[in-house]
Amino acid sequence: MLITSILGPVLTAQFATKLPLPKTREDEENRNIESTLDEWLPQLKNEIKNDHFTVLIPIYNPYTQRDLIEMGALLAKKESGIIVPVSIAAAHVHMDDPQVDGNLKQSQILLDRAIEISQEFEVSAQPIIRIDDDAAQGISRSAKEKNANLIIMGWSENTGLKARLFGTILDTVFWSSHCPVAVMRLLDHPVNLRRILVPIKNLSQATLETIKFAQLFADSNQGIITLLHICDRQTPQEQITEFKTTLSKLITEYELSKECKIKMIIHDSPSQVIIRASHQFDLVVLRSFRRRTAGGLAVSDITTEVLKKIELFFSFIWTTSFMILS
């Protein structure tokens, strides 16, 4: 017993890092990366087969709607697509209630402004007003009805009791939507966001989709993408080199981005690295993995930790815009 307790930690520290990692479900998805990339990437290149690339943008805050419309217009224009501004007017038991008419009038004002902004970017807009007793479901249903390729929403800082008990509109849209959802908090106009940071954990289909989305925005805005991969201190050097080589080959072979840099950092706290590195960029694109559980939507641990720190820094030192792609 004494010998085991003494030698155990020593042997573990020396040999544990050399042992093969157990195969998890995520590993199964990422194995044979060279062969599966050939299957994934053609799908990514041809995934948009609608008549128009459609970006649905819920409008509810007149102070933030310009940046959201501007972002959607940049992406839609790059793909020769359209934007669909949608305003959800709260329903009422009696549809002849004056409050319903007031809600519809306010929605129309917001949509008229959205059309004006879209015209500045020479992008077609198809605004809709939806009467619904659930704003989140109204957004998800509108996106499905319009066969939207992307939903763009603003970041919500609602942390009240109701939000903690029942979740926010963002939580519900993330959980129920059929297409990717981009949630953003922009501290500058989208046309000024050119230095883009994309933290990546591994080479998976989700990673490729995130890079493709960042590329779409970078191409529409003459931006430069930096892919950031953080390794812990126990990662063998040959594994780090192999990852960087494979990623470089992926970028070159499939032309994921013409202006793309790779940065590898060894550190035990990925969230701290992302926070520190973000100050050198205009926009950080984070990935949220949709895992539908009985308790709702679960996001990746690193993204959650970064968001907690972002919330902490918002009021005084946070100076970088960010986007979460689900």
What are these regions (language model features)?
Residues 6, 11-65, 87-92, 149-239, ...:
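Intrinsically disordered or low-complexity boundary/linker segments at protein termini
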Residues 146, 277-280:
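Active-site charged/polar residues at nucleotide-handling catalytic sites that mediate phosphoryl
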Residues 245-249, 266-278, 294, 299:
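A short, acidic, amphipathic alpha-helical segment used as a generic capping/interface helix at domain edges
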